[in-house]
Design a protein with these regions (language model features):
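Extended hydrophobic leader/signal-anchor segments used for secretion and membrane insertion
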Residues: 2-413
Length: 413
């Protein structure tokens, strides 16, 4: 005899299934609403204006001569622009026959952007804003009510210089390239790099703080951007057993070497109009003959030396311990930006030279007269000033309700 399910039991089972389905539908609706109106969305970076923090579409070729890996950016790439790319030059050694393959074009980084207006951002936060050309990503530099100014690459707020916290400086590894004639390395705080624009390639300066370049590289080209003022470079102390360093600091220059007793020895000379080297040339050890010396105990074999040109000072650290610190001369006295380019001198072809230098650096933003921001106005800058269209160009004011939070500096979806 077949059993019969009572009607109330059947109804309860149907009710449970119905409630479960309704709950699933509600959860799906809430999930859709969240992802449609509240959850961050993924956006691609389309330009080089935030390099090296965020990269747009680019190639990353390796120079067959010196082995340097570098970036070739494509701003707002089009098939015609990509097809026109054939060869580029290495920014380190100058080798000019490096091919570009359209199939090897890398996509731009992706970021997660909030859908709602950002809470009041802090200085140096990365934010996104919709513009005529699409979504742009920049860095907050000026806050409402402040007076902002750019002097020789440095941001001034209400008349005082402002630098990023060192924890937010970019970090790069730079390859070294030995120059046979003469036997020395000239390390500057800028590097030209190629950007594809219009019909072909144009030269542009990418503000890395130091890199190797021929001693004949001009230091004051008419259209050259401002130099980077804040950077630090770290290398093993034993590096100084075979080489010596020269640092320019505005109207003065320093020679850094290791004594036979393995003490750090600094010699300083003043760069008067008569003694200052011509543009594009470098000082040599003979320029420091008879200069006053300063010495410091230095763990030459096991330690690391850090040279820092930051916060308007030139400083030397040994494993984090400050050895020397010298304030930069006022700009009004020197008539030139204080950039601290680094020159490495050696007479031995077998001298130990690190294959790479670890560099941390801030960014120079050029020059702009003082500007007072409104009560709800923000001042935005790109990390690659030479390729960034930002608040320096004026135009519409940037308001808080236009900004969106970039919740991750780089997020792959």
């Amino acid at each position: 005899m077949a059993s019969v399910v009572p009607g109330n039991v059947f109804n309860k089972a149907v009710m449970k299934i119905t409630l479960a389905l309704a709950a699933l539908v509600l959860l799906a609706a809430l999930f859709s609403l969240y992802w449609g109106f509240a959850a961050p969305f993924s956006a691609a970076v389309l330009s080089s204006s935030m390099e090296p923090t965020l990269y747009g579409p680019r190639w990353e070729p390796v120079c067959p001569r010196c082995g340097s890996l570098f970036t070739v950016s494509v701003n707002a790439p089009t098939p015609e622009k990509i097809a026109s790319a054939r060869f580029v030059s290495c920014p380190v050694c100058g080798f000019s026959e490096i091919p570009l393959d359209a199939k090897r074009l890398l996509k731009g980084d992706r970021v997660a952007v909030s859908r709602r207006a950002a809470p009041p951002p802090r200085r140096w936060d990365v934010v996104a804003r919709r513009s005529v050309g699409g979504l742009t990503v920049k860095r907050v530099a000026g806050l409402p009510g402040e007076e902002v100014e750019l002097r020789r690459g440095t941001l001034y707020v209400n008349g005082e210089p402002v630098s990023k916290p060192r924890g937010r400086w970019s970090q790069v590894l730079l390859n070294t390239v030995r120059k046979a004639e003469p036997e020395r390395l000239l390390v500057l705080n800028r590097i030209p790099y190629p950007v594809l624009e219009g019909e072909g390639e144009r030269a542009q300066s990418y503000p890395l703080p130091i890199t190797n370049a021929p001693a004949s590289l001009p230091l004051d080209e008419p259209k050259a951007p401002e130099f980077v003022n804040d950077y630090s470079v770290e290398f093993p102390a034993r590096f100084l057993k075979d080489v010596s360093l020269i640092l320019n600091q505005g109207d003065r220059a320093w020679h850094i070497a290791l004594s036979p007793e393995e003490k750090l020895v600094l010699r300083r000379i003043s760069l008067s109009e008569e003694r200052s080297p011509e543009e594009g040339t470098a000082l040599s050890e003979s320029d420091f003959e008879g200069a006053e010396e300063q010495t410091a105990e230095f763990p030459a074999v096991t330690g690391n030396l850090t040279v820092s040109c930051a916060d308007a000072r030139l400083s030397f650290f040994s494993d984090g311990t400050l050895l020397f610190s010298f304030p930069n001369p006022p700009l009004a006295e020197t008539g030139r930006p204080v950039t601290c380019p680094l020159i490495i001198l050696t007479e031995s072809p077998e001298a130990y030279i690190p294959a790479r230098f670890l560099v941390k650096r801030d960014i120079g933003y050029g020059t702009m007269p003082p500007r007072r921001l409104g009560a709800d106005e923000y001042f935005l800058l790109g990390d690659n000033p030479a390729a960034s269209v930002d608040s320096r160009a004026g135009g519409d004011s940037v308001r808080a309700n236009q900004l969106r939070t970039v919740t991750s500096p780089e997020l792959a979806f």
